[in-house]
Amino acid sequence: MEQVKYVKYAKEIEKIRDDFNEIVGGISNKKCNALLNEYMNDIVENSGKDSFEIAFIGQYSAGKSTMITALTENMDIKIGQNVTTDKVTEYKWKNVVLIDTPGIGTDQKEHTDLAFRHMDLADLLVYVVTTQGFDDLIARDFKRIAFEHNKSPKMMIVVNKTSLESMDNKVNWENDIKKVISPSTLEDFRVTFIDAKSYLDSLKQYNDRLKNALMVRSNLSGFIAHLNHFVEEKGIIGRLVSDLNIIGTYLDRILNEISTDEDRKKFKSFW
């Protein structure tokens, strides 16, 4: 039944792509034509993937790279308190590819543009925030990604760095998240609490009691369980949504370049 749904939705999305290509192809505008070429490259890249991709996104210093290090146990990944990721890097983990993206919400536009492009291309997104929660800037960026750009169907939220505060504050963290994601629920985004650094610290520990305590505090096993279930439940949806995300992104960019009312009318009738 799931496969039948996939075929049905895939055909509908293919028709949307064809309609989009036809409309853009009829516009005499060099910048629009250049954007159409970029768009086609992204569509080809997305359709030609042979691995399932999960992108880790969020503010800088939220611990995205640390989380990927904990999952892969690849100690060559650069981690730290400051901006350490300035490019997109892929890491193999089990049967999927984990994508480490630059932090958003900085004054480095090229970092944000790079992260947003891979949000479109990735099959699923893990949005990482810390126990400090959503300030106005982080909340604005999250809502833009999840709701304005329609990426919520392929997103989950992970709260990292739980060791910085008492777990007694978990209810407060959850209430903070609820305000931002409303009317969606914590369950919709599979909100998970972890401390990736504690897991890495456990790997250096020879005392079994301390090692186990750090592993429990990290909750990495809980995160992996949620992530696996997330892939099983949302994987097909995420792959379909990626094409729509790409179309939506280029639709906005091309609309900004269109100069005639007639061409704008064509696009509005499409969307």
Q: Where are the regions that the model predicts?
A:
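Conserved G1/Walker A P-loop phosphate-binding module
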Residues: M1-T101
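Conserved, well-folded catalytic cores of nucleic-acid-processing
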Residues: E12, I16-D19, I23-G26, N74, ...
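Structural beta-sheet core signal
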Residues: F56, Y127, I157-V159, F193, ...
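Short, flexible loop segments at the rims of nucleotide/cofactor-binding pockets, characterized by
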Residues: M75-K78, T101-D107, Q132-D135
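Conserved alpha-helical scaffold flanking the Walker A/P-loop in AAA+ ATPase domains
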Residues: D86-E90, E110-R117
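Conserved C-terminal guanine-recognition region of P-loop GTPase G domains, centered on the G4
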Residues: N95, D113-F189
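Canonical P-loop GTPase G-domain recognition
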Residues: S163-G235
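C-terminal helical "lid" subdomain and adjoining coupling/linker elements of P-loop NTPases
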Residues: N207-S218, V231-F270
